[in-house]
C-alpha cells in the first residue's frame, strides 16, 4: 500500500505542479459538467422540482465539485469537508457509471463509441476522487458522517422518489439501486473508519505516518 500511495502522491504533485496540465484537466472537467448537465440530465432537471436538483446531475456535479476542490488545494485554500465531499462523489458516481456501462454491454452485446468515451471519462472521474481522498486532512468524525449521510440520502431521493439517473433497457433500477447502496456503504465505511481519520489527521499535522 505504501508504494501505491507514493504513486498517487506523485501523480497529484505532477498534475498540480504543472500549470498547463492542471488547467487542461480543469477545462476537461468543466466540459464534462456542461455536456453532462445539459445533454444527459437536462431533460430530467427541467421536469423535476428545484429542491431535487442537487441530487440529480450526479457525475456532472461530481466533476464540478472536484474542479473546485482541486483549485482550492492548489492555491493552499483547502476546505476539508468539501474535499471529502468531492472525493466521495467522484468515487461513488465514477464507479457506479463504470458498473452501469459494463452491465449494459454485457446485456446489449454491442458497444457504441460514445459509450466508450463515457466509460473512459468516468475512469478519470474515479481517479480524481482517489487523488482527492488523499488530501482530506483535518476533518472530524461528525463532518465525515454527514458527508456519508448526504450520499445515503441521495439513494433515497434517487430510488425512493424516482429521481435516479436515466437507465438503459438493460440496466434495471434494482441493479442501479444495489450498486449505489454497495458503493455508498463501502465509501462511507472507509471515510469514517477511525484508522483513516487518525492517519489523515497525522498527515495534516505533519506527523510521520507509517507506510509499508
List the model feature ranges, each with a label.
Residues 86-153:
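Membrane-proximal helix-loop-helix units in multi-pass membrane proteins
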Residues 60-72, 123-134, 179-197:
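Hydrophobic cores of alpha-helical transmembrane segments in multi-pass inner/ER membrane proteins
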Residues 135-212:
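Terminal transmembrane helical module of multi-pass membrane proteins
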Residues 36-45, 98-109, 158-168:
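Juxtamembrane "helix-exit" motif on the non-cytosolic side of transmembrane helices
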Residues 32-81:
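Selected alpha-helical membrane-embedding segments in polytopic membrane proteins
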Residues 3-26:
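N-terminal membrane topogenic signal
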Residues 47-54, 108-120, 169-177:
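Non-cytosolic membrane-interface motifs at loop->transmembrane helix junctions
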Residues 12-16, 72-85, 134-142:
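Membrane-interface helix-boundary motifs at transmembrane edges
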Amino acid at each position: 500500500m505504501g508504494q501505491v500511495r507514493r504513486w498517487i502522491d506523485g501523480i497529484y504533485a505532477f498534475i498540480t505542479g504543472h500549470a498547463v496540465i492542471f488547467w487542461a484537466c480543469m477545462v476537461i472537467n468543466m466540459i464534462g459538467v456542461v455536456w453532462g448537465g445539459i445533454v444527459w440530465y437536462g431533460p430530467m432537471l427541467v421536469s423535476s422540482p428545484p429542491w431535487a436538483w442537487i441530487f440529480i446531475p450526479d457525475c456532472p456535479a461530481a466533476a464540478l465539485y472536484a474542479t473546485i476542490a482541486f483549485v482550492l488545494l492548489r492555491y493552499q485554500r483547502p476546505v476539508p469537508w468539501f474535499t471529502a465531499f468531492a472525493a466521495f462523489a467522484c468515487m461513488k458516481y465514477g464507479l457506479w457509471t463504470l458498473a452501469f456501462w459494463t452491465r449494459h454491454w454485457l446485456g446489449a452485446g454491442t458497444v457504441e463509441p460514445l459509450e466508450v468515451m463515457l466509460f473512459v471519462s468516468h475512469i478519470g472521474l474515479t481517479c480524481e476522487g482517489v487523488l482527492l481522498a488523499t488530501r482530506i486532512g483535518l476533518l472530524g468524525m461528525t463532518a465525515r458522517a454527514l458527508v456519508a449521510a448526504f450520499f445515503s440520502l441521495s439513494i433515497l431521493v434517487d430510488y425512493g422518489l424516482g429521481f435516479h439517473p436515466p437507465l438503459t433497457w438493460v440496466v434495471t433500477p434494482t441493479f442501479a439501486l444495489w450498486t449505489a447502496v454497495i458503493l455508498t456503504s463501502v465509501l462511507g465505511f472507509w471515510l469514517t473508519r477511525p484508522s483513516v481519520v487518525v492517519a489523515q489527521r497525522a498527515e495534516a499535522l505533519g506527523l510521520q505516518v507509517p507506510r509499508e
